[in-house]
């Protein structure tokens, strides 16, 4: 038997906690036998003293084990259980293509996703722009969809990593969110509860990233790879660029439209293609569905070319109560904004810099995201035809096309776009989409 205050004291004095001490504390968070003050105190001591790798693994596994851990053995699946997690960005719609692409190659992807947070878009919000789409199927239905379709994208239920929910709520109001061991445990507790064989992390870098600097993004990626592998799940991470909007669009319905166009081959943004393919390659190799990069890319390109990936997406939408003909008739089903109009730069030039975070907040301000949990989302608003770094803009080439609910909203958004995009006399040097791969 342990005392919470003695565990806090031990960490306060700079000592490493044992696995048993960490499990006692996390179980107490779940059972409400540990107070909010005690959670805050431990979080602050971890913030200042960090954690060793064994402590980080113990914390993550204790949080994972605070609730249900999915077990797929009874389904006798003939492929690996794999997933991807992104630290979030703007126009980051990779999940909607990646899940079906990997499923079409023989993987099973039980993706538990989140809503928009701050300036970043949420996969669940995007999917809810599809009429009828059910993000909370019951457990049996979730398992059926995984077995039959190969991929389902759902919301987090209260039974998955419940200790994380309470721990995070306290961190949020005590300035202890940005601690790498705590971020790592929070992300991985939920992902490892999916019962995965392999995981790839997409850690964003740049003006629209969760972490403010390249070095911190790199440190987070290394921590996640170390802890997840320590917890027994084959994990790699990619550091990918978020110095500009990833897709050509940012919003909810507009990103779903782009995802369908990507899968069917109607239109593929080259940067979005690069990042999506790179993440899928990691999933296929870690999941032992391909032996190397070349084989993985060939398999992925094949399921795009032969329509299998698009077919899997359509089957997932139908299985989660969306329209059965969504892929064929997406334009009929997705909501459209009242006003769609381009915004142009005041001068000619080359796009040299983009405040991606500000563009994400502009989508939120238009109604495309939540400022507080009770807000309702306008799924139709957002940006399309976004200019990319290096593009020449003038009276013919707009900065973006704005989808707004009215003229006032359009005016505010156009000001935000102009303020967020800087122009120069010559094009900047191109930057990579993937900066670094991190493995154990």
From Swiss-Prot:
What's the EC number here?
A: 2.4.2.4
What Pfam families has UniProt attached to this entry?
A: Glycos_trans_3N, Glycos_transf_3, PYNP_C
Q: Pull one GO CC term from this UniProt entry.
A: cytosol
Q: Which GO terms describe its molecular function?
A: 1,4-alpha-oligoglucan phosphorylase activity; thymidine phosphorylase activity
Q: Which reaction does it catalyse?
A: thymidine + phosphate = 2-deoxy-alpha-D-ribose 1-phosphate + thymine
Q: Which SUPFAM superfamilies match?
A: Nucleoside phosphorylase/phosphoribosyltransferase catalytic domain, Nucleoside phosphorylase/phosphoribosyltransferase N-terminal domain, Pyrimidine nucleoside phosphorylase C-terminal domain
> Which pathway does the protein contribute to?
Pyrimidine metabolism; dTMP biosynthesis via salvage pathway; dTMP from thymine: step 1/2
Main EC class the enzyme belongs to: transferase
Instruction: State the source organism's domain of life.
Output: Bacteria
User: What's a BP term from Gene Ontology annotated to this protein?
Assistant: pyrimidine nucleobase metabolic process
The entry's keywords: Glycosyltransferase, Transferase
Instruction: Please give the Gene3D superfamilies that the UniProt record associates with this protein.
Output: Nucleoside phosphorylase/phosphoribosyltransferase catalytic domain, Pyrimidine nucleoside phosphorylase-like, C-terminal domain, Transferase, Pyrimidine Nucleoside Phosphorylase, Chain C
Q: Does the keyword Nucleotide-binding apply?
A: no
Describe the task this protein carries out: The enzymes which catalyze the reversible phosphorolysis of pyrimidine nucleosides are involved in the degradation of these compounds and in their utilization as carbon and energy sources, or in the rescue of pyrimidine bases for nucleotide synthesis.
Member of which family? Belongs to the thymidine/pyrimidine-nucleoside phosphorylase family.
Record's subunit section? Homodimer.
The name under which this protein is listed is: Thymidine phosphorylase
What gene is behind this protein?
deoA
């Amino acid at each position: 038997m342990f005392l919470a205050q003695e565990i806090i004291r031990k960490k306060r004095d700079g000592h490493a906690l044992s696995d048993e001490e960490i499990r006692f504390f996390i179980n107490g968070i779940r059972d409400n036998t540990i107070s909010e003050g005690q959670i805050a105190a431990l979080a602050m001591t971890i913030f200042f003293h960090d954690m060793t790798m064994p402590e980080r693994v113990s914390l993550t596994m204790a949080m994972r084990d605070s609730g249900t851990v999915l077990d797929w053995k009874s389904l006798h699946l003939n492929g690996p259980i794999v997933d991807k997690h992104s630290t979030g960005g703007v126009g980051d719609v990779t999940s909607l293509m990646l899940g079906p692409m990997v499923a079409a190659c023989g993987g099973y992807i039980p993706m538990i996703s989140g809503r928009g947070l701050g300036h970043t878009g949420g996969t669940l919000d995007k999917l809810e722009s599809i009429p009828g789409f059910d993000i909370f199927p019951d457990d049996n239905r979730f398992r059926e969809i995984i077995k039959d379709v190969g991929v389902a994208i759902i919301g987090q239920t209260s039974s998955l990593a419940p200790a994380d929910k309470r721990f995070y709520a306290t961190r949020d109001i005590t300035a202890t969110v940005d601690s790498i061991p705590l971020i790592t445990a929070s992300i991985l507790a939920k992902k490892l509860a999916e019962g995965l064989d392999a995981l790839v992390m997409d850690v964003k870098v740049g003006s629209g990233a969760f972490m403010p600097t390249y070095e911190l993004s790199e440190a987070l990626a290394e921590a996640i790879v170390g802890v997840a592998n320590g917890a027994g799940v084959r994990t790699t991470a990619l550091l990918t660029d978020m110095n500009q909007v990833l897709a050509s669009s940012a919003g909810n319905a507009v990103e779903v439209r782009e995802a369908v166009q990507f899968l069917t081959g109607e239109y593929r943004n080259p940067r979005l293609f690069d990042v999506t393919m790179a993440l899928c390659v990691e999933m296929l190799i870690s999941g032992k569905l391909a032996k190397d990069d070349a084989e993985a890319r060939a398999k992925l390109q094949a399921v795009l070319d032969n329509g299998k990936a698009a077919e899997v997406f359509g089957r997932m939408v139908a299985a989660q109560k969306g329209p059965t003909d969504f892929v064929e008739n997406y334009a009929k089903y997705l909501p459209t904004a009242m006003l769609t109009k381009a915004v142009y730069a005041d001068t000619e030039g080359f796009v040299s810099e983009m405040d991606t975070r500000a563009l994400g907040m502009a989508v939120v301000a238009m109604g495309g995201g939540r400022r507080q949990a009770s807000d309702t989302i306008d799924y139709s608003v957002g940006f399309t035809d976004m200019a990319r770094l290096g593009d020449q803009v003038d009276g013919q080439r707009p900065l973006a096309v704005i989808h707004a609910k009215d003229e006032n909203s359009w005016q505010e958004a156009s000001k935000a776009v102009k303020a967020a995009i800087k122009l120069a006399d010559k094009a900047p040097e191109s930057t990579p989409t993937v900066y670094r791969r991190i493995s154990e």
